[in-house]
Regions:
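Membrane-embedded multi-pass helical conduit in multi-pass membrane proteins
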Residues: 170-246
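Long helical/loop segments within the catalytic core of UDP-sugar-dependent glycosyltransferases
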Residues: 1-11, 15, 34-104, 152, ...
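Catalytic donor/gating beta->alpha subdomain of glycosyltransferases that bind UDP-sugars
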Residues: 39, 46-71, 100-103, 108-169, ...
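A conserved hydrophobic position in a structured secondary element of the catalytic/binding core
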Residues: 27, 97, 117
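Acidic donor-binding/catalytic loop of UDP-sugar-dependent glycosyltransferases
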Residues: 23-38
Length: 257
């Protein structure tokens, strides 16, 4: 798989930096130079980037932007993340590694059996006393999944690994997602047209703002409350999968979350 290819490719490399990036990403011409400059200026041993996630069609727009709004909220302060003081986070679509630091932590062989190897890379570097930074980057673009089915299965796997053990965070996210929807549905079935309309408008406005903040088209906010229900469903299933140690199939392989 990818980690094995990275391990093979890194053998005998004498350059001071290693770049791990996905083949389906598109980079601005100066992206690598800017990432390297940020690492040198801030004294970082790894720089990872969160790029623009491209989505097409209703299925992808239903789920992907809300997922990234959730991840953005959980990350917290982006300035702290960029300075290397936030959580140990990395995005496998772009990780620039100081070779000596990564080799001191054991290299790619140490994350060969980990489902979320990018997060594991950041965690190992932090555990070894090294500094990792996480940045937003409009110069990195990628379309992660094709259609609703891929997006659903992909984020079920990813969220299981990222959040499955954080029961408090999962419960809080589900409450934020589902309580307004429950209020809207209750008002609708009770014939409270004005209240239901106001709740729907508030939900659409919130969805639009979150989409705008993550670089996606705000007009898809009119999918509310379907987008909130979709995210809640994927998040709940991811948490259950993690609790049960369930095996999920991904690209022909079974992976335990």
């Amino acid at each position: 798989g990818k980690v094995h290819a990275l391990w093979v490719g890194a053998q005998g490399v004498a350059t001071p930096w290693l770049l791990s990036t996905d083949a389906d990403t598109r980079h601005a011409p100066d992206l690598l130079a800017r990432a390297h400059a940020a690492a040198e200026e801030r004294g970082l041993d790894a720089v990872s980037l969160a790029g623009v996630q491209e989505v097409r069609g209703a299925g992808e727009n239903l789920l992907v932007p809300p997922v990234f709004a959730l991840l953005d909220a959980l990350l917290g302060d982006w300035e702290e993340a960029a300075a290397g003081r936030g959580p140990a986070v990395a995005n496998g679509q772009f990780i620039l590694l100081r070779r000596e630091a990564w080799e001191a932590c054991g290299g790619f062989e140490t994350v060969r059996h980990v489902p979320l190897d990018d997060i594991a890379v950041a965690a190992r570097l932090r555990a070894g006393g090294f500094r990792t930074g996480f940045f937003r980057a409009s110069g990195l673009r990628v379309r992660m999944y094709r259609g609703w089915g891929e997006a659903f299965q992909g984020w079920r796997r990813n969220l299981g690994g990222l959040l499955g053990a954080r029961h408090g965070a999962v419960a809080a996210a589900l409450a934020v997602l589902l309580l307004p929807v429950a209020a809207f549905l209750a008002a609708s079935v009770s014939g409270l047209a004005v209240e239901a309309t106001l709740l729907w408008i508030a939900g659409v406005a919130a969805s639009m703002l979150l989409r705008y903040g993550s670089g996606h088209r705000p007009a898809w906010g009119f999918l509310y409350p379907l987008d909130a229900l979709a995210l809640a469903g994927v998040l709940a299933l991811a948490a259950v999968d993690r609790r049960r140690g369930r095996l999920l199939s991904w690209k022909g392989r079974e992976m335990r979350v």
